[in-house]
Amino acid sequence: MIIVTGGAGMIGANIVKALNDMGRKDILVVDNLKDGTKFINLVDLDIADYCDKEDFISSVIAGDDLGDIDAVFHEGACSATTEWDGKYLMHNNYEYSKELLHYCLDREIPFFYASSAATYGDKTDFIEEREFEGPLNAYGYSKFLFDQYVRAILPEANSPVCGFKYFNVYGPREQHKGSMASVAFHLNNQILKGENPKLFAGSEHFLRDFVYVGDVAEVNLWAWENGVSGIFNLGTGNAESFKAVAEAVVKFHGKGEIETIPFPDHLKSRYQEYTQANLTKLRAAGCDFKFKNVAEGVAEYMAWLNRK
């Protein structure tokens, strides 16, 4: 059996799809479906069972026998960079992750988890070491602290433990994320409503490493199949502008002119203007995966979003 926490979320559901594509259906999805709309992410996927997050973590803490587990993909977390309830974030993103990590270590179950480029804050080297990290928000700090915890235990681990610092992930199965959904998602909705796509003023200068979620899922499976341990950046290694995303959306629809809107005050000083994954460590680990660029990934995503 394979466990995917956050399996009804964007990245988790895409990992489930990638597992299905390789013939695996013996999958336990763990999630919190208080937001019932997330069920749609699982409708076309094959899983063996579902477990509520709270029930699952209770079983983990109790040390219950969950069966023969081949791997755990831990994608469940609060991913809102605008969330400032630190107690909630630390419980959900840090304490929960530690419990599951130790459950896996004790049983030598390969453990793969979601970290984030938010751990870097406004630092621009994007190298997977503590000296290059400095989160700007509580979400980033919760992910940073778990990375630090993993670094401390890695030398003694007898089974794979692998974290991925996700950069700007976009693609299918993100519709439940609301304001935290990707720019491509929001621009598509604007055009469908007959509006012009809107970007923040200055967006031509904001460069991000936009990585397609299908590629993210494939690299997770590569790490599992190759028994990889460590903490790695997961982006394309190439920063592109928000304008490039908008142009790809406009090209798909064949209509719309890009407009600019004022930059929100509440995001100033907490906004990463530039991200670009340094892939040196990932490539050195043997990953030669070819990532989609914005034009390729957004075109595929638009076709998926607008399918009949």
Swiss-Prot record:
Which residues participate in NADP(+) binding?
Answer: 10-11, 31-32, 38, 53, 75-79, 92, 143, 169, 177
Q: Which GO biological process categories is it annotated with?
A: ADP-L-glycero-beta-D-manno-heptose biosynthetic process; carbohydrate metabolic process
Which cofactors does it use? NADP(+)
Keywords, in A-Z order: Carbohydrate metabolism, Isomerase, NADP
Superkingdom per UniProt: Bacteria
Tell me which residues this entry annotates as catalytic: 139, 177
Q: Does the keyword Cytoplasm apply?
A: no
The job of this chain, per UniProt, is described as: Catalyzes the interconversion between ADP-D-glycero-beta-D-manno-heptose and ADP-L-glycero-beta-D-manno-heptose via an epimerization at carbon 6 of the heptose.
Family (UniProt): Belongs to the NAD(P)-dependent epimerase/dehydratase family. HldD subfamily.
- Matching NCBIfam families: heptose_epim, PRK11150.1
Name it.
ADP-L-glycero-D-manno-heptose-6-epimerase
